[in-house]
């Protein structure tokens, strides 16, 4: 395919144009008075969302060069989502502000490499300062506040997530399910999560989120490698007749057997998924036994005299729901309370008897996984469109809460970054020089961008409010919901330090890359290629 090549300023301007389109589409959702965005879907009803990364993933432009700009800024949102699970809109707004500010200086003749070094050093300074200002999360009130803000100022949801964390612990698993009613409910159930994802992406049932979701699934657990497809055929036929999903945990599944499972899945003959067994050695056997107790099943093993090719359906266990991503598996069990409590008691005795600190730690980890259970939030809504939006908000709230527990909280609503802008300006002028100083000042000027946008979305003058916030003490910020200056901690307007930090780091990384771009090579648009071929063929020989 023919390529189009752009150099220097025109290359950077084309990237900026694409970034402008995406940043504006995402920025309208920021803050308590942020608006929604409607996404057209090829199939089904349009989706109404308020989630930055979901909007960013949907935007695809006709112009290949502008689309490259979109892809770059989308990366800032995606990476922030991967690290912190929230703060994607803030990351996008920051990245665009830094690029816009930096473009002016590069166009005026500043050295982009020196500017990038200045941006990196200034960002590192802000990250350290955020960590110094972060307050640890010690009570459920703080957890409620963080969750409420991330769920779009929904206090009920915040309280529900705080309850869930209180019941399953800070390391516990919180799962989202589609409810049957219009109200959102919390339920604590037996279940566990382990660090193994699907063996093949062909098992995925939700391509948008790259997840496998199986409801009312049958469980097959074996401690051997499944090499021959003949071993699986008898049980697969029985499961197909029962018309139930099948979930397999095995030491490994070799190519031939895996190919058979994938083909049957793709043809719709069988709803099947498989993961490798977690852990290794004796720990692997113990963990498989834990899962077997949880799902009321038997481990198919030579030691117990059970063979894969001769088992019946009554040997298989059951789970209410299985969620599998590329990294981990969550099992929500169907209630084998007696078996689970007996197994927990057994593990407790082992903890008392062992002298090894490592062994003790691993046994406690197993006990926490088995006894902690899973908090299931059943999302209720009147329509499917509302349900999807609610699920995205809840997901953000859960991620933000876990991030807050990890690294503490700071004043929210763009306040922290706005206050740190003054501190950073002073540090930059004392510690950086020449074009590195310009890079540092780019970061300092961009730090107020999220606050300005939150205020503008609420219908006020962003620049004026940002200057007023800078003059006030660190905890004082602007509450855009009621247009008042308040103590952000007292008002419950807080952000997880991890979200603020990772958003800034990813924004600075993308801005540095864009500013140091000198050439773009992209595919030529089809219309241009056709025009070129018409011109070539129009000579009069």
Curated annotation (Swiss-Prot):
Binding site for ATP: 29-32, 86-90, 413, 479-481, 495
Keywords carried by this UniProt record: ATP-binding, Chaperone, Cyanelle, Isomerase, Nucleotide-binding, Plastid
GO cellular component terms given for this protein: cyanelle
The keyword Nucleotide-binding is assigned to this record: yes
E.C. numbers: 5.6.1.7
UniProt entry tagged with the keyword Zinc: no
Catalytic class of the enzyme: isomerase
GO BP: protein refolding
Family: Belongs to the chaperonin (HSP60) family.
Full protein name: Chaperonin GroEL, cyanelle
Organism annotation: Cyanophora paradoxa
């Amino acid at each position: 395919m023919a390529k189009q090549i752009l150099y220097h300023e025109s290359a950077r301007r084309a990237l900026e144009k694409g970034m402008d389109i995406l940043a504006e589409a995402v920025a309208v959702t920021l803050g308590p008075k942020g608006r929604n965005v409607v996404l057209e879907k090829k199939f089904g009803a349009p989706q109404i969302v308020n989630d930055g990364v979901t909007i960013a993933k949907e935007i695809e432009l006709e112009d290949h060069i502008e689309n490259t700009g979109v892809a770059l800024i989308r990366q800032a949102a995606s990476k922030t989502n991967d690290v912190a699970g929230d703060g994607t809109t803030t990351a996008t707004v920051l990245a665009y502000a830094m690029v816009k500010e930096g473009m002016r200086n590069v166009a005026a003749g500043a050295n982009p490499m020196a500017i990038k070094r200045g941006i990196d050093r200034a960002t590192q300074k802000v990250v350290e300062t955020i960590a110094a200002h972060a307050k640890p999360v010690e009570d459920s009130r703080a957890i409620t506040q963080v969750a409420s803000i991330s769920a779009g100022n929904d206090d009920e949801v915040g309280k529900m997530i705080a309850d869930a964390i209180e019941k399953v612990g800070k390391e516990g698993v919180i799962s989202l399910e589609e409810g049957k009613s219009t109200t959102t409910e919390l339920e604590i159930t037996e279940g566990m999560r382990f660090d193994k994802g699907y063996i093949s992406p062909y098992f995925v049932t939700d391509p948008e989120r790259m997840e496998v979701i199986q409801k009312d699934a049958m469980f097959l657990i074996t401690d051997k490698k499944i090499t021959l497809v003949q071993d699986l055929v008898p049980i697969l036929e029985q499961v197909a007749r029962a018309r139930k999903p099948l979930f397999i945990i095995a030491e490994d599944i070799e190519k031939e057997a895996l190919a058979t499972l994938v083909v049957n899945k793709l043809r719709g003959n069988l709803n099947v998924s498989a993961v490798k067994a977690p852990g290794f050695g004796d720990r692997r056997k113990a963990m498989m036994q834990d899962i077997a107790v949880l799902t009321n099943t038997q481990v198919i093993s030579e030691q117990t005299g059970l063979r894969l090719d001769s088992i019946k359906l009554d040997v298989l266990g059951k789970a209410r729901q299985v969620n599998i991503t590329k990294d981990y598996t969550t099992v929500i069990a169907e209630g084998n309370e007696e078996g689970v409590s007996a197994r927990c008691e057994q593990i407790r005795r082992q903890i008392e008897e062992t002298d090894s600190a490592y062994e003790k730690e691993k046994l406690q980890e197993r006990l926490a996984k088995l006894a902690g259970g899973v908090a299931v939030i059943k999302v209720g809504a009147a329509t499917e469109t509302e349900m999807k939006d609610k699920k995205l908000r809840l997901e953000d709230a859960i991620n933000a809460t876990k991030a807050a527990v990890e690294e503490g909280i700071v004043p929210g609503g763009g306040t922290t970054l706005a206050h740190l802008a003054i501190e950073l300006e002073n540090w930059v002028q004392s510690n950086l020089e020449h074009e590195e100083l310009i890079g540092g000042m780019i970061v300092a000027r961009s730090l107020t961008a999220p606050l300005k946008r939150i205020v503008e979305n609420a219908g006020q003058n962003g620049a004026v409010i940002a200057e007023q916030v800078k003059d006030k003490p660190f905890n004082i910020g602007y509450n855009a919901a009621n247009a008042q200056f308040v103590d952000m901690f007292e008002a419950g307007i807080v952000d997880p330090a991890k979200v603020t930090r990772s958003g800034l780091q990813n924004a600075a990384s993308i801005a540095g890359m864009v500013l140091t771009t000198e050439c773009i090579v992209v595919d030529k648009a089809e219309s241009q290629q056709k025009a070129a071929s018409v011109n070539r063929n129009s000579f009069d020989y």
